[in-house]
Structure formats: C-alpha cells, structure tokens
C-alpha cells in the first residue's frame, strides 16, 4: 500500500515526462512521496510529499499557489529540491545522498508503513518539510497537525485524478491519511500558507499549506521517521504504524523484506544465467509483485467502491490498482501461476468491487475508484485467466453470477461494470466505429464461454462463443484486413493499414493479428499461407521500440495489442520465426535506465519478458496453456504450488541460439508448439528439456498438427453470418440532397491564440446578445442547460484539450443544434472550434441556413421544401485525431454565405460527439 521513493519529474517539464514521477535523466530530486505506481501510462500516485533539508527554511513550498488552481507552480515544488548522487536500491529499500544539503536519505518499506532515516551534516540544523499540495496531480484540500510533545506530524490530503496534465483531482477522488513519528524532539516547527511562514503554529488546513519540523544541530545528526498511511481514517494510519514500522528498526524491517523476497524468487528460480540477465529477470519479477497492492489497513478495514468502510476476513486482503486491459494478457496468468493464493485474493477483490460498486467487474481501478480507462471489458478476461491458470479460493458460483450479469446488460451512464454499446454489439456483432473494442469484446466473450463451460452453463457458453466469433464481420474480403464499421454497417474510412480510426493505442495492421482465440480462422480469411508469411515478415521489419507508434503499421513491442503477434508464425508452420522474434524482443530489456521497450503498465510488459525468457506464453485468454517458443535462459524452476515444480532446461540457451533444435517433455520427444497447463502440472510437475541452436530447425513444430489450438473455430455459425447489410443512413441521405454553397477551410492544431474568439466587431453574436443556441436532439448534449448551450457562444475558447467545462458534445454523436441570431443578418463566415486529445477533436457536421422570422422545422428528412439551405458539408477527420480543429466556412468567391437568421448543425448518427468549444458567426 505504501511505496516511498524519490520524485524528480513533473508534467512534461524538460520535454519528457515520467507518469510515476521518476526519470533517470533528471538531475535533481524534488521531494519524496509515500505512494507510487509502477510504469503507469497516466499520472497517478505521488501522494504526501516530504523533503529533508538544512538551513533557515526561507523558501515557501506554496507561495506561488494560484487561487482556483489545483497544482502549485514548478518553483514551489522545487523549493527544497537537491541534486543527488550515490543512489542504491534493493527489494523494499532505497538510499541516496542529496548533494546540495549533504543529507543521506534511507527509505525502507513495510506493507502499510515505512522507516525513513535522515543523516544530516554535522552541526547543521536539519528539518523535514511536509507539503501535500505538491502532489504531482494537485490536491483539493489538506490538513496538517504537528504534535511537538509526541514528536509527531499527521494529516490528510484530498486528491484524485488519473490523466495527463492539466490535472483535476476532483475526478476519481480519494482521501489519504498519514502519521509520522520521529525519534528526536522538535527544536522548531510551523506551517506555511500562501501568505508566508508562521512559526510555532501547529495546524493548518487548505489546498495550499505546508508544515515543517526542525531538529537541534547540536543533538543527534541522524533522525528516524516512522510513517504510515491509510485510506480509511486517521486511526487507521496510527494503527498501521503501531502494527508495523513502530515494532522494528531499519535492519529488522529490511531483513523481513529480504526473507519474503527470497521466498518469492524461489517461485520462479533462475540459475546459470549471466549476471545482467539475472538482474533483468529479478527486476521484472519484482515489478510483477508490486500490483495489485494491499489496500486494507492492518485491522482489515478498507474503503470500498461505494465509499463505505468494510472489513475483510482475517488473513484476507483487499487489493487495489488493476490495469486490467494491460495485465490480463501476461501479469494475470503469471501471478496465478506463482502466487496462486494472492491471485485468488485479487479475484475475490474484483468480486467485492462489483458488489460494492453496484455493477460488474472492475476495468481499471485506482485505489477505490473505477477509472473506466481503456474501455472494453477486460475484467472478464482477467478473472477467467486467473481461474484458468490456478488462482486459489475463488467462489465460482459468485464469479459466474457477476460475469454473466455484466456481460448481458448495458453499461449505465457514468458507471462501469457493463458492456458499452451492448445492444449494438449483440444485434450487429460489432461496436460501431471501434474495431479494437469489438476484438477485445470477442476475447472477453471467448474467455467467458470457457468459464461457463467449466461450471456447466452450456447455454451461456454457446451464446458467448457465438459472440466471440463476430470479428469475422470486420474482415474486409477484398482488402484482406480488419477495420471498423459504422452503425449502419458501412466501413469506417479510411481502409488503410496505418489508420487509427476505430482502434485504441494502435492501427489497423497492428490489430489485424489480434484474434488469439481463433487465429487459424482469421488466417484462412486473409490469404494464402505464403502471402501471409510474407505479410507478417514485413510487419516485423523493422519492429518498433519505445516512443509512440500507434499510427505505424509495424510490430510495436512496447505495447499490449501486438504482444502476441510473433506467435502467429506458429500457426503458419514457421515457429522458428517466432523463436527468433521473441528472443530479439527479450533482448530489448536491459538492466540500465530505460531498460524496457515501453510502459510497464503495472507489470504487463515485464511479465511478457519473463514468459518470453521461459519460452512459454499464455497466448489464448481463458485457456490454461502456453505457446512454446524456446527459452533464452538455461535453468528455470517454476513452483506452481508445494510439490509441483515445472522444470525448464535449455542447453546452449542464449541470444545467439534462439532456435529450438529439439524438445522433450518428461523424457519423451515433443513436437507441438503448444502445451497445456494440465500437462505441465501433472505428477509433481513436468520437465521440459530444450536443445537450442544458432540455426532454425525448420522441421520442428512445422507440421499442421503441431500448430497451437484455435478453439474459437468450434462454434457452428449459420450461413451468411459474416455478411453485414448496409442500412439507410439519414445523415448520408441528407448530404446527397444538397449542394453546399460555401468554401471550407480546415485546420488542425492551429495557433488558437491568434484565432481565439471573439472576432470583435465582426462577430455577429456580440451584436446580437439575444442570440441563442438550442439543442434539438435526438440525443442530449453534454453541457446543455434546459436545452440551451450558452457556452458555445460565450466568446470563450477552451482552456485545454478535453475541457468539459468549456466544451459541449452529443452523447453518441447524433444531434441537431439551432442558432438563432435574433434577426435575419448577412453572414460572411462561420467558425467552429473543437479541442480534444483523441478522436472527438475532428468535426463532422452539415451546416444549414434559413431566413426568418420563423424557424423552419429542424427535424426534417427531406431537404427539398424544408426551408433550409445546405451551406457546408464538413469532415475534418482526414486531418487526423487529436488536438485543436478549426473550420472556417465562407462564400466560395469571397462573398457572404447569404442572409440568415437561423443556422442548423446536424451531426451524424452513431458518431462519437465532437468536443465543440465555440461557434462564431461573422458579418460584414
């Protein structure tokens, strides 16, 4: 639960940001925090900053805090920053020397508490500064109390958020409590507010307060702080301290951690490997044991997803921080294999969260909040994987109830635990405009089907197997690829390998290979084996390491959607190619800074390294088994449970010998490229003996019967299942009924400072204060009040991308807006602004005009005789997703658009709603 460590990176300062607060290239430690997450893709953690220092404490850590701002300034945050040297770390501890102040800092962690030791320079007055406001995400409120008699500092911070800058800690809120006990008396103490320092004041509350305690320079030069946290209450923090760090000194705490770490290492024991490989192996295993982490206090209490206090049974844990879209692929199976008792607790936590949240299984949890990050429904896949790979103590009846209920009900607005677009998905077989989420839904459905079959629910097993086959509806028969479809069944353009439209964190070619439950059927629809081998070889040449490569139609080894792509070669009769690729990918992991090809995403990437190095990979979600690719390391013992040990032995293993020459399982020759977990676990555990070599053994594993299974092909589908009829589309029909009378200029990421509203005297809205914008429907518009959307004509642009306080958008995308200018006026130009980080920035609408005095009916289906004239047909999608978009609509020959009182925007059906920030109308 606690994870103390250094913080030296904020909000893209320096051009590159670490979302967890530490970057090896940074030269100064800003402060230390009590919480961190491992390799998370968005800013999280970084709670309760503190910093030891020396001197007169003349700098305020909150002086620059602006009213209404959640985050303090960079200057404030770095008020007591220091350059550093002599960093050292091990399992559960960290040490560093702060060069500017000369302070040696040592941190050691227990589950809910920590010991911090500060060795101050001789004859210098040391102090420790506490500043909750300098949380990387900002805070809403905080409280600090100093107890000089008891040598304690305690308090809490209200924070939250899970995003890139700018931050909003009011979203996904939580309160974190702390208490810190010192072994030296306070010579001085006080607090800071934005107005300045107040010595001798023992308490402060607010979003911009800090506290300090100072020590006698003539006394002990070494001061120890014992600190604990709680998400329940202040008493919980005190009890956690008493149960853990208060009972031990630093050597004893480290000894206990070392003993536990060695036990964990024994579950995945490595021998005979070079030291650098051992460091990478141990580091990746360590990262996979950090999350999900304990969230309950020592007395078993925890704050649930309903924000109420609950208690787990004795010996049980409530886990927090699941990056499920990432971790179901690798971390979940690994944890079920090597820590099955804890993995069972993680599954039980998911079931508790579902019950407390009133919904289904969680998706991406941060503490006791569901972030709904990454969409899809991966909770079902993770739970099925935990069960399939051996997690212990899971109530299968409760799991079955939650899984089926969640998979068969629509997700309620602003909650989680159901399937988004469920009605469309069940009726049509795909989620409109999202190929990647359809593919992910299929994977979850397949895992659900396997689970239902396990518990004897054949009816739902067949239902979910049929749903899992709907990826077939996204395969373009002529272009031989997978793309998204619109709600009417038409294809979502463009149909190119690099398009990201309809794909999450990837493009069409990256997601093409992602049908792990039915890879053989996928390949049969994409071309001949010879053509596919060439296409797949080109996909990996070159493969991409690091950076953001979502729009590049190549293998991106640092991101999850392509994690299983190398193993497709096993289905094409060339497993030796997969062996080479997996060895090359594993070689991108090093024991230095930046030693991982992408975000770790709470263990997902590091778990893939462990599986790659073992020569086994859990390719098919929900199925307890592995694709075989050949180990990189010579001697691995994987203990599944007491008395069951899988032994992996690989002669000549290493980066220069990536190819399997032969394999025996328990002494018998084995040529298949798949092995079941049941086989590995039988009779006390199997022994896999590989002979590795520098040249491919093309005869091994290359027969059709050697290929891995493709269990999704078991379902019998009706004739014509893959055919998708294209329905009538009102938006498309209306487009065809008019001839736009305008010239349209489209810009992406323009310099909005030079185009910011208002237009001045040319802005008709400034001359027509009675101008209004009304929502006609058919869908509600976020940002509307009683059908009006004044924020779209208030002369104010958005402050940043994805700003819901300044933007308005239709749920589902389809809707109509009418602007009434009060009088018929000459309109020379219409400007439309939008701003969003993702696929809601592009603008897609039809603009119509009508004269007064009475507004024609806006809900028309036939333009002829409607009273409306089509002025513009706008689609800025070709500019790409993300950023700021501006559309300028003017007369074709530089003249006016015409004389109009009413302007009508029609947005298309089943589109995600554009984040409009402002609509402007200019006159002569």
Label each region the model flagged.
Residues 1-439, 452-473, 479, 484-510, ...:
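Accessory carbohydrate-recognition regions in carbohydrate-active enzymes
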Residues 125, 813-814, 822-829, 898-900:
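Extended extracellular/luminal ectodomain segments enriched in beta-structured repeat modules
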Residues 631-633, 655-659, 838-846:
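Short coil-to-beta strand junction motifs in C2/discoidin
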Residues 706-715, 827, 913-924:
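Exposed low-complexity, polar/acidic, P/S/T/G-rich flexible segments that act as propeptides
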Residues 719-824, 835-840, 872-883, 918-924:
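Disordered, acidic Ser/Thr/Pro-rich linker "stalks" and the adjacent N-terminal cap
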Residues 825, 833-879:
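Non-cytosolic beta-sandwich-type ligand-binding/adhesion modules
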Residues 882-900:
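Short, surface-exposed tryptophan/glycine-enriched loops
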Residues 905-912:
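Short beta-strand-plus-loop segments that form exposed binding edges in beta-rich domains
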């Amino acid at each position: 639960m606690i994870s103390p460590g250094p913080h030296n990176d904020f909000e893209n300062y320096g051009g590159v940001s670490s979302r967890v607060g530490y970057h090896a290239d940074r030269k100064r430690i800003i402060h230390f925090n009590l919480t961190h997450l491992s390799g998370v893709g968005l800013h999280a953690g970084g709670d309760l900053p503190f910093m030891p220092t020396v001197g007169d404490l003349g700098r305020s850590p909150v002086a620059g805090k602006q009213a209404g701002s959640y985050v303090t300034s960079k200057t404030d945050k770095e008020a007591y920053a220091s350059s550093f040297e002599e960093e050292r770390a091990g399992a559960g501890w960290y040490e560093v020397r702060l060069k500017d102040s000369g302070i040696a800092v040592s941190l050691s962690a227990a589950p809910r508490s920590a010991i911090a030791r500060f060795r101050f320079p001789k004859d210098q007055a040391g102090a420790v500064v506490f500043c909750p406001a300098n949380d990387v995400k900002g805070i809403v409120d905080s409280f600090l109390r100093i107890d000089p008699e008891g040598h304690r500092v305690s308090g809490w911070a209200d924070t939250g958020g899970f995003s890139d800058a700018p931050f909003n800690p009011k979203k996904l809120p939580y309160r974190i409590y702390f208490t810190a006990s010192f072994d030296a008396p306070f010579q001085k103490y006080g607090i800071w507010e934005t107005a300045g320092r107040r010595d001798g004041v023992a308490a402060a509350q607010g979003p911009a307060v800090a506290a300090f305690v100072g020590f006698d320079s003539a006394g002990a030069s070494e001061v120890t702080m014992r600190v604990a946290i709680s998400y329940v209450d202040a008493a919980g923090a005190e009890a956690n301290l008493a149960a853990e760090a208060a009972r031990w000194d630093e050597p004893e705490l480290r000894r206990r951690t070392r003993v536990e770490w060695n036990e964990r290492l024994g579950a995945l024991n490595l021998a005979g490997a070079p030291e650098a490989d051992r460091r990478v192996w141990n580091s990746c295993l360590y990262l996979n044991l950090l999350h999900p982490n304990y969230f309950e206090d020592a007395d078993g209490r925890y704050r649930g997803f309903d924000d109420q206090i609950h208690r787990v049974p004795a010996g049980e844990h409530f886990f927090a921080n699941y990056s499920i879209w990432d971790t179901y692929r690798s971390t979940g199976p690994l944890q079920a294999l090597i820590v099955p008792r804890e993995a069972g607790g993680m599954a039980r936590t998911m079931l508790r969260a579902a019950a407390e949240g009133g919904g289904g299984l969680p998706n991406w949890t941060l503490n006791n909040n569901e972030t709904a990050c990454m969409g899809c429904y991966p909770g079902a896949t993770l739970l099925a994987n935990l069960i399939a790979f051996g997690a212990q103590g899971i109530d299968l009846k409760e799991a079955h109830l939650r899984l089926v209920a969640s998979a068969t009900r629509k997700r309620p607005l602003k909650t989680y635990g159901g399937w988004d677009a469920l009605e469309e998905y069940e009726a049509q077989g795909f989620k409109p405009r999202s190929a990647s989420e359809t593919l992910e839904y299929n994977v979850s459905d397949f895992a659900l089907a396997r689970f239902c079959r396990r518990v004897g629910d054949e009816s739902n097993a067949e239902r979910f197997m049929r749903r899992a086959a709907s990826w077939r509806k996204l395969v373009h028969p002529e272009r031989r690829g997978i793309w998204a479809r619109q709600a009417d069944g038409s294809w979502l353009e463009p149909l190119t390998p690099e398009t990201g439209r309809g794909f999450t964190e990837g493009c069409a070619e990256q997601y093409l290979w992602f049908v792990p439950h039915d890879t053989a059927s996928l390949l049969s629809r994409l071309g001949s084996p010879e053509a596919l081998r060439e296409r797949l070889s080109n996909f990996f040449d070159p493969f991409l390491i690091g950076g953001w490569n979502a729009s590049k139609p190549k293998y991106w080894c640092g991101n999850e959607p392509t994690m299983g792509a190398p193993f497709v070669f096993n289905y094409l009769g060339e497993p030796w190619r997969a062996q080479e690729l997996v060895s090359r990918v594993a070689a991108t992991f090093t024991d230095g800074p930046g030693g991982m090809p992408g975000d770790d995403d709470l263990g997902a990437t590091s778990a893939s390294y462990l599986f790659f190095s073992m020569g086994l990979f859990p390719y098919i979600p929900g199925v307890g088994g592995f694709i075989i690719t050949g180990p990189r390391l010579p001697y691995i013992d994987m203990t599944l449970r007491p008395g069951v040990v899988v032994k992996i032995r690989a002669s000549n293993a290493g980066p220069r010998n990536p190819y399997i020459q032969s394999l025996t399982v328990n002494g018998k020759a084995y040529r298949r490229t798949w092995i079941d977990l049941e086989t590995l676990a039988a009779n006390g555990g199997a022994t896999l003996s590989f002979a590795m070599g520098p040249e491919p053994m093309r005869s091994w594993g290359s027969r059709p019967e050697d290929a891995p299974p493709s269990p999704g092909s078991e379902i019998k589908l009706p004739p014509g299942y893959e055919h998708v009829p294209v329905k009538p589309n009102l938006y498309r029909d209306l487009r065809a009924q008019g001839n736009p009378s305008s010239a349209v200029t489209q810009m992406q990421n323009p310099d909005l400072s030079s185009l910011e509203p208002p237009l001045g005297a040319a802005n008709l809205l400034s001359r027509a204060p009675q101008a209004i914008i009304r929502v006609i429907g058919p869908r509600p518009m976020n940002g509307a009040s009683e059908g009006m959307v004044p924020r779209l004509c208030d002369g104010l642009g958005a402050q940043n991308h994805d700003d819901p306080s300044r933007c308005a958008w239709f749920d589902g995308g389809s809707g109509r807006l009418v602007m009434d200018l009060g009088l018929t006026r000459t309109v020379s130009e219409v400007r439309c602004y939008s701003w969003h980080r993702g696929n809601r920035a592009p603008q897609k609408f039809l603009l119509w005009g009508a004269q007064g005095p009475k507004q024609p009916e806006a809900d028309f289906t036939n333009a002829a005789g409607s009273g409306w004239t089509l002025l513009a047909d706008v689609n800025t999608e070709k500019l790409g997703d993300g950023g700021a978009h501006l559309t300028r609509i003017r007369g074709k020959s530089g003249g006016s658009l015409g004389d109009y009182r009413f302007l009508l925007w029609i947005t298309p059906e089943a589109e995600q709603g554009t984040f409009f920030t402002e609509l402007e109308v200019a006159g002569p």
